[in-house]
């Protein structure tokens, strides 16, 4: 059972400005066409979440320090977005190839943090079941989905996305 005194922390990868510009212009076009402004209004930056963990408030500094040290030790990497995908016609995303860089960073993060902190998000980011993606639109109805998908298909794929930063969100 979930302990409501715990805080959820998401660890995410961020892209180069060039890739961000492509994704953000797509988010904006989808919002303008469909009226679904969730991604824009919530100021969600383009990212790939590589882990989500619960921590008590008094353990936050420890988690943040572990992630900061982990980020410092990472080698440069990139992902290649190869297709547009969806979750049940409700979420539209860019799907990267699950390459060695992504698999390794996801696995190593969990190896480091799971002994200390509880998994969050029903374990969706655990290495064996993780499905890396960058959300373009979420909470779509059927007509919004069709319009959003047409816009997303205009992104020139494959798209090479250098990773510029590893960040933590609450």
Describe these PLM feature segments.
Residues 50, 93-94, 136, 168:
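Short hydrophobic/aromatic-rich beta-strand segments that constitute the beta-sheet cores
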Residues 84-87, 164-170:
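Glycine-rich beta-strand-turn "strand-cap" elements at beta-sheet edges
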Residues 90-100:
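Short, low-order "capping/linker" segments at domain edges
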Residues 87-90, 129-130:
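Acidic/polar active-site rim loop that often engages polyanionic ligands
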């Amino acid at each position: 059972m979930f302990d409501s005194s715990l805080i959820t922390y998401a660890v995410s990868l961020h892209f180069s400005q060039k890739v961000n510009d492509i994704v953000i212009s797509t988010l904006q076009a989808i919002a303008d066409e469909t009226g679904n402004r969730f991604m824009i209004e919530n100021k969600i930056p383009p990212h790939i979440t590589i882990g989500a963990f619960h921590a008590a408030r008094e353990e936050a500094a420890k988690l943040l320090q572990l992630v900061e040290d982990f980020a410092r030790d990472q080698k440069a990497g990139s992902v290649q977005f190869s297709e547009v995908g969806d979750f049940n016609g409700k979420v539209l995303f860019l799907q990267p190839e699950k390459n060695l860089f992504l698999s390794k960073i996801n696995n190593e993060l969990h190896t480091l943090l799971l002994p200390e902190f509880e998994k969050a998000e029903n374990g969706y980011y655990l290495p064996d079941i993780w499905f890396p993606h960058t959300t373009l639109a979420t909470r779509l109805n059927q007509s919004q989905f069709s319009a959003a998908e047409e816009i997303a298909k205009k992104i020139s794929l494959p798209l090479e996305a250098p990773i510029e930063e590893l960040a933590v969100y609450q």
